[in-house]
Amino acid sequence: MITIFLSLFALIFNNSEASKTEKVMKFELIQLPYASDALEPVISKQTIEFHHGKHLQTYVNNLNNLIQGTKFENADLETIVKESDGAVFNNAGQVLNHNLYFTEFSPKGGGKPTGKLAKAIDEAWGSFENFQKELETAGTTLFGSGWVWLAADKDGKLSITKESNAGNPITKGLKPILTFDVWEHAYYLDYQNRRADHLKALWKIVDWQVVE
């Protein structure tokens, strides 16, 4: 009888612990679609390991802890970003932003977009080269930490937006298309204070098939 009781207790305890773990791990660190050294020399292996493996992991852990027991506990990431503020928004925003950022690159990237995106860029800026210059300028002139975005409104009209800290254009009703990270942890190991060089180099690894 005691053995059965202890077995039942262990089962209940383990299920309870599994449930707690499941809640804590609601959001998980995304797997990179390339090796950690695949984007060199544009982004070094060391930067990827710190940026993805440590910085992003911390945001994921923080977010999971912050949303437990709140109305966001079962919400998807975009909903949390749109409806939250404070620490929850900051960490959710950083998780969403980094998920988009890390998956838009490829060691076989570069070149130019094609199709509808290429046409929309030409309509908005006259040429792809003009668009590149404007996005680089936006990223270089953004004061402090943040993100520079190519985004589209509900009619498909493109714009470049600068968002401080964890900002994302979805909070303005826009659809994110492409983003460059201008937090120092994204480039300082490789480019030190040369943010402009970092932004210019990123074009070499943008996977336009993913972006489009």
Language model segments and positions:
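Feature for soluble, non-membrane regions of globular proteins
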Residues: 17-212
